[in-house]
């Protein structure tokens, strides 16, 4: 505990690198390696799409299992176990090319990644228990900078690596990613250990969540899951459809990642000030704008602007629901609440790309799918806007943060 008080930001850095592994490399690097895998292995779009679905199904299962286990095992144990196993699964992905092997490990990457990702928020929520503003910033850095770092590193290196060495070197790309994640592991595990606390009393751990009072926030977060993933899934395809060069595509991804990294600075005050659904509604509106902009106004400037707007907002949605849980629920309910939000998100993001793909096929233009995703995000924003702060919040937390609607 003494070391935590002395070096809380170093502890946060370890947690953020955990998100870099589980939410960055484990999920978004796949989209950059996939073209090489398709080219080398002769996969069709159905096979490539199946691996995305397999990963999402694993993520759902991992989120559900975490929700069931969070009352019995500490967040530290679940975070550490999920992180180690995600690292091993990333390494295994580069060993054998057969589709059944790739399916197995994409499922497990999703499963273990969800376990570590959802508990990272629980751990970060306890970093500054008596300083809501710093706590809001810490949670935003966890998801924003942690996830954005992986997109910057992946976007800057993977396309160039595969272009230089050839598509048949995709297995080595996975091994390199696993090696980088392995370097992060010691600090990640150290940070989690510094935040280890005794398991909560069983009676409290099993106390039901006030779902009837937080349904609007849950529905808004479902809209986030449905909409954001469409942009990230089809961004490269849309740019290719618009005849963008490989270097420009890489530049857009790097700009997107850098914007994600600095997004905590943009949203920290809003996240700390409001205990209602307003922060999530504002974030979803910005994501919707970023998704629609390149379709409504085609061109390089529009794409670069969309990358900035989308990047400054997209990873703040998990920060918004984590802060909402922290500001409105007692500490022993944070784990269950964040796990529930993760389950809702996981189911929604599984449906999003499939539905968007169907819409794009019917319309003959993937841009229609981006507009559809923008509409879902706006609907989620409207619903989230109706979320009010809960009555009887945890004593001391909201009063210090200047709770507003």
Task: List where the protein language model places each region.
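Conserved MFS/SLC helix-loop-helix module at the cytosolic interface between two early adjacent transmembrane helices
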Residues: 61-98
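Helix-loop-helix hairpin linking two adjacent transmembrane segments in secondary transporters
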Residues: 98-101, 134-193
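Extracytoplasmic gate region of multi-pass secondary transporters
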Residues: 30-31, 213-264
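Helix-to-loop junctions at the C-terminal end of transmembrane segments
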Residues: 62-74, 263-275, 360-361
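C-terminal transmembrane helical hairpin of 12-TM major facilitator-type secondary transporters
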Residues: 275-324
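Paired small-residue
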Residues: 89, 100-109, 301-309
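Cytoplasmic helix-loop-helix junction between adjacent transmembrane helices
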Residues: 105-145
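A late C-terminal transmembrane helix in Major Facilitator Superfamily
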Residues: 326-365, 373
């Amino acid at each position: 505990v003494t070391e935590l008080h002395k070096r809380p930001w170093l502890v946060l850095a370890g947690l953020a690198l955990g998100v870099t592994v589980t939410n960055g490399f484990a999920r978004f690097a796949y989209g950059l390696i996939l073209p090489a895998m398709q080219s080398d292995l002769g996969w069709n779009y159905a096979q490539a799409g199946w691996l995305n679905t397999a990963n999402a199904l694993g993520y759902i299962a991992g989120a559900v299992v975490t929700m069931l286990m969070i009352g019995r095992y500490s967040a530290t144990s679940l975070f550490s176990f999920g992180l180690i196993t995600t690292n091993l699964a990333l390494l295994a992905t580069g060993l054998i090319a057969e589709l059944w092997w790739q399916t197995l490990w994409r499922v497990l990457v999703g499963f273990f990644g969800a376990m570590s990702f959802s508990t990272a928020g629980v751990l970060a929520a306890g970093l500054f228990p008596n300083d809501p503003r710093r706590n809001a910033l810490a949670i935003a850095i966890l998801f924003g900078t942690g996830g954005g770092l992986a997109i910057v590193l992946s976007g800057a290196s993977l396309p160039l690596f595969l272009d230089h060495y050839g598509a048949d070197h995709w297995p080595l790309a996975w091994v390199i990613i696993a090696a980088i994640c392995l370097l992060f592991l010691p600090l990640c595990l150290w940070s989690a250990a510094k935040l280890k606390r005794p398991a909560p009393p069983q009676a409290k751990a099993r106390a039901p969540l006030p779902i009837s009072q937080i349904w609007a926030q849950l529905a808004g977060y479902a809209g986030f899951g449905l909409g954001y993933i469409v942009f990230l899934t089809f961004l490269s395809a849309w740019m290719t459809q618009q005849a963008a060069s490989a270097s420009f595509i890489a530049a857009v991804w790097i700009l997107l990642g850098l914007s994600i990294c600095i997004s905590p600075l943009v949203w920290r005050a809003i996240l700390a000030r409001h205990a209602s659904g307003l922060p999530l509604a504002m974030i979803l509106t910005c994501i919707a704008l970023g998704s629609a902009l390149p379709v409504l106004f085609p061109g390089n400037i529009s794409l670069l602007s969309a990358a900035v707007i989308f990047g400054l907002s997209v990873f703040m949605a998990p920060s918004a629901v984590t802060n909402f849980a922290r500001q409105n629920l007692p500490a022993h309910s944070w784990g269950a609440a964040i796990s529930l939000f993760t389950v809702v998100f996981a189911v929604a993001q599984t449906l999003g790309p499939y539905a968007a793909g169907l819409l794009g096929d019917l319309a003959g233009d993937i841009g229609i799918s981006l507009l559809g995703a923008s509409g879902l995000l706006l609907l989620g924003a409207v619903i989230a806007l109706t979320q009010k702060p809960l009555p009887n919040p945890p004593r001391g937390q909201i009063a210090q943060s200047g709770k507003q609607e």
